[in-house]
Regions:
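C-terminal transmembrane helical hairpin of 12-TM major facilitator-type secondary transporters
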Residues: 277-324
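Juxtamembrane intracellular "pre-TM" segments in multi-pass secondary transporters
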Residues: 2, 183-217
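Helix-to-loop junctions at the C-terminal end of transmembrane segments
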Residues: 59-70, 263-276, 362
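Conserved MFS/SLC helix-loop-helix module at the cytosolic interface between two early adjacent transmembrane helices
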Residues: 57-95
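Paired small-residue
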Residues: 81, 85, 96-105, 304-312
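Cytoplasmic helix-loop-helix junction between adjacent transmembrane helices
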Residues: 101-142
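Helix-loop-helix hairpin linking two adjacent transmembrane segments in secondary transporters
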Residues: 126-182
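Helix-breaking motifs and short loop linkers at transmembrane-helix boundaries and internal kinks
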Residues: 36-38, 70, 91-97, 108, ...
């Protein structure tokens, strides 16, 4: 990549970082929101769902819109919407108002990752694409790992409203960066056609998802189930089994984000050595190591293996997901925005399913069962993926 291309990728990565952080920083703030808004703890988790559902479900929609109207133009609108929505959340006087603001924010944030991924595909050469997407997603998911710790600290020091303001300001900075993107090599938008519409979009999306490239999209779905499913339970695991309070647990989870950043920087080299399918294999091996370390942590009650597991989980995820994005761009080069959006859709819908299935596993056999089931599922994904994914 040239220095200008790297600048574009890092600018887009920062936008993705803010969009990912905007979801995950809320989790440690939930107890404070319960106290301030005087609501039951059992219902406040709807704040997370209110953001995550549109964030995942609308990624293919935003990707397809970007294909038609232009990616930079769309990014300027949706990043601005993310900033405004996050700042509005800080002013919410009640839980219904906060939920409404989170839904609105999630709708704007939904397109940032998928549109940015497709734009990176426009900016860099095919040879540099895997490395560029890896760097983009490494920066993006650093936000997921770091935001939980930062959100918890800000909430403890100055309150949850201040946390929303801080992340809203970061979104404004991201918007200013997008406004400076000019002449970055985006291909011309197709401008729409008479056949466009909801029915045509759904038909195209289903045809693409279950078409010849279905192995790529279905692997994204199972990746979400396993990696995000495991990640979602690590915070409660650290509290219940390792005895860590909220802030130390959040700080430990920041190693997930640091590993994402490191893995995103290394993914291009790994791809050069082993190919795209080999990069996915390395990521899956790292995920298996994370499951094994979490099992050790469960048996011993020590948080040290869990710290290494958080890093392995982040490294594994950032090697698998962006590589699937790169493979998806070849499924239909005329609709790269839709294809990258379908990857995001698969991952986040899978993450939601993983949370539900993980809860069943814990109810049936505790955290030991969760880690064992996750390892078995990932081993199965590895075997099937090695045979089914494109040999690149």
């Amino acid at each position: 990549m040239t220095s200008e291309q790297r600048r574009v990728v890092l600018t887009l990565g920062f936008c993705g970082l803010v969009s990912a952080a905007d979801n995950w920083f809320v989790s440690p703030a939930l107890p404070a929101i319960v106290r301030t808004l005087a609501v039951a703890p059992s219902v406040v988790a709807v704040i997370l769902t209110a953001y995550l559902v549109p964030y995942g479900a609308l990624q293919p929609v935003c990707g397809a819109i970007g294909d038609r109207v232009g990616r930079v133009r769309l990014l300027r609108v949706i990043v601005a919407g993310l900033a405004v929505g996050t700042l509005v959340c800080a002013l919410a006087p009640s839980l219904p108002a906060l939920v409404a603001a989170r839904i609105l924010t999630g709708c704007f944030a939904a397109g940032i990752i998928s549109v940015s991924q497709a734009l990176v595909g426009d900016v860099v050469s095919a040879e540099d694409r895997a490395a560029a997407v890896g760097l983009l997603m490494g920066v993006t998911f650093t936000g997921q790992g770091l935001s939980a710790g930062l959100g918890g600290i800000i909430t403890e020091l100055v309150g949850w409203r201040a946390a929303f303001v801080c992340f809203g300001v970061l979104a404004v900075v991201a918007w200013l960066g997008v406004m400076r993107l000019r002449g970055v090599g985006e291909r011309e938008a197709d401008g729409g056609s008479s056949s466009s519409g909801a029915g045509a979009f759904l038909s195209s999306a289903v045809r693409t998802f279950f078409g010849p490239g279905r192995a790529v999209f279905l692997t994204a779905f199972t990746t979400g189930i396993i990696y995000l499913g495991v990640y979602g339970f690590m915070g409660t695991f650290l509290a219940e089994r390792c005895g860590l309070s909220s802030t130390p647990a959040c700080l430990l989870m920041m190693f997930y984000g640091l590993a994402c950043l490191a893995g995103g920087s290394l993914s291009g080299r790994i791809g050069g050595w082993h190919g795209l399918r080999g990069t996915i294999l390395v990521g899956e091996a790292s995920g298996l190591a994370a499951a094994g370390l979490l099992l050790v942590s469960t048996v011993t009650g020590s948080w040290v293996p869990a710290l290494v597991a958080a890093a392995c989980l982040g490294l594994g995820y950032i090697l698998v997901q962006p590589t699937l994005v790169s493979l998806s761009m070849d499924v239909d080069p005329a609709q790269t925005g839709l294809c990258t959006g379908l990857i995001g859709f698969g991952v986040f819908v899978g993450g939601g399913a993983g949370s539900t299935l993980g809860g069943f596993a814990i109810s049936a056999g505790g955290y030991e069962a969760l880690w064992i089931v996750a390892a078995a599922a990932l081993a199965l994904q590895t075997v099937i993926g090695w045979r089914a994914l494109p040999q690149k």
